[in-house]
């Protein structure tokens, strides 16, 4: 009983983090990052207490545990053996007396220490969600939470577009010279908002699919259809072109995966389906007029002229020049912002402006973590997608509950979308997106064990109870 209280508390607190992080500027301010970290820490501590009281091991794959432990050890060593601290006033690295002089260490101790705290918590969340996903009830609750959070963020963005506000609703507009024009919803940068929406709207679509494919109540169908339409409209209203392109690719993938199922379910009510399609079309037209969809269309028209002169190309060349110096362990977690200016000044083709992130998460990870850390992160991320695909193909039809069979492909599709987005932007550097990616990876890795805890769990429990009853009667 006590262990269940701690377990339930840890899960509800985790759901609170899923709500808080996107609304708190996407986890891009120091305050929102600290609060999110504390909430995640509370959830993980309660989960560990629940494991100790119940005397059970977490239901996670061994390979996942090894990868998370290896990443924490490598990053922790880089912090422990840090070689310097970056002085922002004089733009110089101040040497430190480190433990091993000729062994790799971070070039900036404070940044790497802060980043590793966040990384350790997020890696713990991957394990936490892998364990949580073994429960069909909590898996469905997690699905609902993601759908509601995505719909709320999308609605905020649409309201801002419709009212023509100059800044996020609860913030005063800054002076014109420093005015932010790329915000959307609670995110300062529309690219991050688009990446987040592309993570959540496929799961909103899955809730619609589940509602129509099963005998759900009409109000459930109406609710999740509305949430899905709002989220899709927000993707269209957002001016991030990459997010819109990825959304189109995700929509095609979802239609290929679930289109035949929906067609079979809707053929029995053609008139209802036709009326619903007409209503959806009218709603989308109304949305387009209200949220000024002509703005993202104009950005598409002018994009061809900007591609060749985009400063990201210069930054990419500078970063590529720094790769040989990163070596096996990199410059240290989170140190791109202090390493890049040094190489940019020395470059023949300097990238203008200040670069906190590279707009290429893979290359930035290689610089910060080196080849060893980069390979481990790739195994965690892409290995999770591969594990999810293999589990789905092998166990979905004979052993998984219907909700798992619908959810898992959508999770993998969403992860592929953010992986593509990371080629030209920095979604994987934003804590709210990192949190949702960690959640999805936990679902993918946890699916390895769904064959043991899926539909057969309740059947085995009933058989065990019947066997014990029969044994007791015999005695």
Model regions and ranges:
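Transmembrane signal-anchor hairpin modules in multi-pass inner-membrane enzymes, especially those
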Residues: 1-148, 167, 206-225, 252-280, ...
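Membrane helix-loop boundary segments at the extracytoplasmic
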Residues: 22-29, 236, 362, 366-369, ...
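Helix-loop-helix junctions and helix-breaking kinks within/between transmembrane helices
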Residues: 25-36, 157, 188-191, 224-260, ...
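Hydrophobic transmembrane alpha-helices of multi-pass, membrane-embedded glycosylation machinery
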Residues: 37-45, 201-204, 244-257, 381-384, ...
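Membrane-interfacial helix-loop-helix modules of multi-pass inner-membrane proteins that assemble, modify
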Residues: 79-107, 142, 152-195, 229, ...
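A membrane-periplasm/extracellular boundary helix in multi-pass inner-membrane enzymes
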Residues: 81, 155-164, 232-239, 243, ...
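TM-adjacent membrane-interface loops and short helices in multi-pass inner/ER membrane proteins
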Residues: 189, 313-355, 362, 369-376
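Hydrophobic transmembrane alpha-helices and their immediate junctions
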Residues: 371-409
């Amino acid at each position: 009983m006590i262990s269940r209280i701690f377990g339930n508390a840890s899960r509800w607190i985790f759901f609170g983090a899923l709500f808080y992080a996107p609304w708190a500027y996407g986890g891009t301010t120091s305050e929102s990052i600290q609060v999110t970290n504390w909430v995640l820490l509370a959830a993980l501590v309660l989960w560990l207490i629940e494991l100790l009281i119940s005397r059970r091991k977490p239901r996670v794959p061994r390979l996942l545990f090894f990868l998370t432990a290896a990443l924490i050890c490598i990053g922790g060593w880089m912090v422990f053996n840090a070689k310097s601290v970056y002085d922002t006033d004089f733009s110089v690295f101040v040497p430190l007396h480190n433990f091993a002089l000729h062994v790799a260490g971070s070039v900036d101790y404070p940044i790497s220490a802060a980043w590793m705290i966040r990384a350790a918590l997020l890696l713990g969340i991957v394990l936490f969600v892998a364990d949580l996903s073994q429960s069909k009830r909590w898996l469905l609750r997690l699905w609902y939470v993601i759908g509601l959070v995505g719909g709320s963020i999308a609605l905020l963005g649409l309201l801002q577009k419709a009212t023509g506000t100059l800044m996020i609703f609860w913030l005063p507009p800054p002076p014109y010279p420093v005015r932010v024009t790329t915000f959307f919803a609670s995110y300062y940068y529309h690219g991050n908002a688009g990446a987040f929406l592309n993570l959540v709207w496929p799961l909103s679509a899955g809730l619609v699919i589940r509602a129509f494919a099963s005998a759900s109540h009409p109000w459930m169908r109406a609710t999740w259809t509305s949430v899905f339409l709002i989220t899709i409209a927000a993707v269209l209203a957002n001016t991030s072109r990459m997010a819109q392109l990825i959304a189109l690719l995700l929509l095609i993938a979802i239609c290929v995966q679930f289109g035949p199922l929906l067609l079979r379910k809707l053929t029995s009510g053609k008139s209802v389906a036709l009326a619903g399609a007409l209503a959806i079309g009218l709603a989308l037209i109304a949305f387009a007029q209200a949220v000024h969809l002509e703005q993202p269309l104009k950005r598409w028209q002018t994009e061809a002229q900007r591609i060749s002169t985009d400063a990201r190309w210069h930054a990419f060349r500078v970063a590529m020049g720094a790769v040989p110096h990163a070596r096996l362990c990199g410059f240290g977690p989170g140190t791109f912002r202090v390493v890049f200016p040094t190489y940019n000044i020395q470059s023949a083709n300097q990238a203008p402006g200040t670069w906190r992130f590279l707009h290429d998460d893979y290359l930035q990870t290689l610089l910060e973590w080196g080849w060893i850390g980069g390979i481990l992160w790739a195994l965690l991320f892409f290995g999770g997608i591969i594990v999810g695909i293999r589990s789905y193909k092998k166990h979905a039809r004979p052993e998984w509950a219907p909700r798992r069979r619908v959810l898992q492909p959508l999770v993998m599709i969403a992860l592929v979308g953010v992986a593509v987005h990371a080629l030209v932007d920095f979604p994987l550097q934003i804590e709210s997106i990192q949190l949702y990616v960690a959640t999805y990876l936990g679902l993918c890795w946890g699916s390895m064990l769904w064959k043991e805890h899926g539909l057969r769990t309740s059947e085995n429990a009933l058989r065990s109870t019947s066997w014990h009853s029969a044994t007791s009667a015999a005695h």
